[in-house]
């Protein structure tokens, strides 16, 4: 039990330490702002030992708290990355360079090509699809002349991998509500 108490005292910095090196050497290892305050305030080695012990006990209290991430400090002004979706309705092929730039900036792009000439729209889709492939992105047709292009950080998935096919029934003419003419004539002739 005594060994544990000695360890506790040593850990908290209360046990007698070997003679401190000359004050000039110790002060020179401190950051400039702290060095000036310590010398001006007239702190001796006892004050430094006390503050070290205080820091050690704070560290022990934090680590004994049980949460591993309790000592993580967020950087002020740094926000977590957010995803951005850009909706474009280009009118010419010249705007495709901007689409590629958005993808390089890891932004998702939805392109509505209904305003473009069909031949130029096909050329535009081919161009952006090539750029998307080059950056390991993904592409998906989501409607008539509407396409989704995503960077490699975004995965595109559909609820089911099978394409839903409409039910195909053989074409039948509906059953008439009135009797056919032939049957009607037979029934009238028998009366």
Curated annotation (Swiss-Prot):
InterPro entries: Cell_div_SepF (IPR023052), Cell_div_SepF/SepF-rel (IPR007561), SepF-like_sf (IPR038594)
A biological process from GO: FtsZ-dependent cytokinesis
Keywords: Cell cycle, Cell division, Cytoplasm, Septation
Domain of life of the organism encoding this protein: Bacteria
Region annotation Disordered: where it falls in the sequence: 1-77
Cited Pfam families: SepF (PF04472)
Principal place of residence: cytoplasm
Disulfide-linked positions: none
Entry's localization field: Cytoplasm
GO cellular component assignments: cytoplasm
Assembly behavior: Homodimer. Interacts with FtsZ.
Family as reported in the entry's similarity comment: Belongs to the SepF family.
Task of the protein: Cell division protein that is part of the divisome complex and is recruited early to the Z-ring. Probably stimulates Z-ring formation, perhaps through the cross-linking of FtsZ protofilaments. Its function overlaps with FtsA.
Protein name from the UniProt record: Cell division protein SepF
Organism listed in the record: Synechococcus sp. (strain JA-2-3B'a(2-13))
